[in-house]
């Protein structure tokens, strides 16, 4: 059976449980950030979740490429067979779970909620090729388990243990824990939600910052950056170097997210003092490939360079100088640059309308 999918709750959801528990002050900051644009990787992950849910539910799935089917769906289903080799599991896919009155308005969706004998099973699909996600002490899955225990009692009736499973083809990670551990997590979550609504809710940096959308404006991280730029590296001992290296990835992520936030603001016509949108440096392309072939032969270029038509850069290297009028410079998009950059600023539609009006 398949439950209706729902959006994740705003205060905390499965994927944000670790951040909210470790940094309750992040909730208010994230609420003020502009909405995120879904990446192509996220869209692909959503598609794969929908496809595998339909297959398990006995429905006709959306069409996907043969590569995705063979490298993601087939191995994922094979790994599911390791969890349920005898096909004994009672299960639901994409099922909404929540905490009821215990923590109002906090909910999420479990990819697969199941039960075999005295064991409840919480299974999450991960189709990304990046960092391998561990199941042990995974707060996202403990969130789903705690919420399912309150809202889907059938999966916990007579249960003495809970198994958290992450299938991330070609890997599978499994961890069996107790109902008592899920209860302790639930208490942690309750306390964090209570703290999150306070104006002085604590902020704390750590691994949970990785996917936080408020990272670019977080005072904890901006403070760490301020301290880092003042460090005199020649004076650091080996222990201090080790400590700074541990923080480096976090600061790299902060810088990347800050640039992305500023770029998105400029793309939307907002003003970032000292910065502007400019066209990316153009790549030369042939204006007319047929005319380019004729001109290159006349200039002395021979096969196979003409038959396959090499790039303007390669042709120029061989001929020393290209005939005039054969190429055009094409920009691949816009990028952010300081006002001191000599390239002219690109005005977005909203800015153009202001100038006209």
Where are each of the predicted segments found?
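Short amphipathic alpha-helical coiled-coil/interface segments
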Residues: 52, 73, 189, 244-262
